[in-house]
Amino acid sequence: METTVKNSSSDGEWKVVLPSKGRQGRRRKPKPKGQAEEEEQPWKSDDLEIDPQRQARLKQKMEISLKKIESSSFYTAFLEQLKSPEVSNQIRLVLGSETQLQMVMYGIGSIESYESPRFQLSIAILMKREFDWVGDNIEVFDPVLSATESSYLESLGCSVLSVNEQARREALKPTLFFMPHCEANLYSNLLQANWRMDRLSKIALFGNSFQMYEEQVSFDAEVICATKRIIAAQRVTSEFAIETESDDYFAAFHDSSWHFFSSGIDSELPLFVSD
């Protein structure tokens, strides 16, 4: 019997999110994944007008989300995990001789339309306030962002990227990639762009559990292609799952983990024919 890799869905099922599936907070129409879609491209929002009234309403929504997250037991547990010896030691290894991680957020979704993206952005902002090792400038990209959303993000001190990197950024310096509930191919793109230990070791990744991808098997060719590098990376990955017991934050953060990469005596990265 065929089983599927699972992730976020309205009925609670966990399945791989492929580019044609979309996810909460995305307004683009489904389209097949082609060569051009996988390449880095200059980007401008389809919604070019900055609406002051919409921006004021968005600011109010974000203030509510920030306060709700900051006062929650979920956030308390989130901070405790980051400050634990196991995770903080991993962060120190990623930092190396540097003092800060550059934070890059891919696939945030529409913060104007949906609460889950606002919760995810709130966590990133609160991390920046809490930890000196989070860089001052948070870089953000999602092709669904409107001009109003981009303007608001910039008012928070974020930089909205003008190029769709397809998550193919090389980690030339210590980088925190903040990618909760992104499509599987974006994690694969990130890994492929950094498929050498001196690059992977500079990455802290917050996103879908790699272990979950490995545990759930599929015979679908597209799913196998999207997840093969994720599964191969497991041999050099230290994963720390976060707790999402509260229903309020389950949709935004369920099955999310911290991932760090380091090679051991008996582990090395496999070669892929496509590389």
Curated annotation (Swiss-Prot):
Q: Is Protease found in the keyword set?
A: no
Q: Which InterPro entries match?
A: SRR1-like, SRR1L
**Predominant place of localization:** cytoplasm
Q: Which GO terms describe its biological process?
A: circadian rhythm; red or far-red light signaling pathway; red, far-red light phototransduction; regulation of circadian rhythm
Q: What UniProt keywords are attached to this protein's entry?
A: Biological rhythms, Cytoplasm, Nucleus, Phytochrome signaling pathway
Composition bias type Polar residues, residue spans: 1-11
Q: Which stretch carries the motif Nuclear localization signal?
A: 26-29
GO-annotated cellular components: cytoplasm; nucleus
Region ranges (Disordered): 1-49
Induction field:
By light. Not modulated by far-red light.
Localization recorded for this chain is: Cytoplasm; Nucleus
Compositional bias of kind Basic residues = 23-32
What exactly does this protein do?
Answer: Probable regulator involved in a circadian clock input pathway, which is required for normal oscillator function. Regulates the expression of clock-regulated genes such as CCA1 and TOC1. Involved in both the phytochrome B (PHYB) and PHYB-independent signaling pathways.
Q: Which family does it belong to?
A: Belongs to the SRR1 family.
Q: What is this protein called?
A: Protein SENSITIVITY TO RED LIGHT REDUCED 1
Source species of the chain: Arabidopsis thaliana
